[in-house]
Amino acid sequence: MLMPKQNRVAIYEYLFKEGVMVAKKDYHAPKHPDLEKIPNLQVIKAMQSLKSRGYVKEQFAWRHFYWYLTNEGIEYLRIFLHLPPEIVPATLKRSVRAETVRRGAVGRPDAPARSAEDRSAYRRAPTTPAAHDKKADVGPGSADLEFRGGFGRGRPAP
């Protein structure tokens, strides 16, 4: 599609910076939500062009296109945008997270002490027969089957 070079460069810069691009499947939208002043149609067509050359992978779900840069696409955009190799897309950067503290009874001083015996006490069978309230004759395969015939073609009704 014929589009101004500044629009194509803006699309490629955003794609390289983020590593991904999302666009709603709306060819008549006046502008793309992330790229101001650029029509959604131009974004979709530029990404389709990159997809046909194998520089991005495309996913489509719920009326939205999702494009992910491939390694070849990163190299192509570095050459096209004249970027040094030190600059990488946001998807390749490691996110720095603080060590998360695990919540639970392990770290709380006010939590009651538990042992393995306490946790498995509910699994044990009752010690007295009177306390046993489970039925042994329930479940699949425990009932006696009885075929009495029915309303079929071979036998009339009784």
UniProtKB/Swiss-Prot annotation:
InterPro entries: Plectin_eS10_N (IPR005326), Ribosomal_eS10 (IPR037447), WH-like_DNA-bd_sf (IPR036388). Residues 149-158 have a biased composition (Gly residues). Pfam families: S10_plectin (PF03501). GO terms for molecular function: RNA binding; structural constituent of ribosome. Residues 99-158 are annotated as: Disordered. It is found in: Cytoplasm. Gene3D superfamilies: Winged helix-like DNA-binding domain superfamily/Winged helix DNA-binding domain (1.10.10.10). It comes from the Eukaryota. Keywords: Cytoplasm, Ribonucleoprotein, Ribosomal protein. GO terms for cellular component: cytosolic small ribosomal subunit. Transmembrane segments: none annotated. Belongs to the eukaryotic ribosomal protein eS10 family. This is Small ribosomal subunit protein eS10.
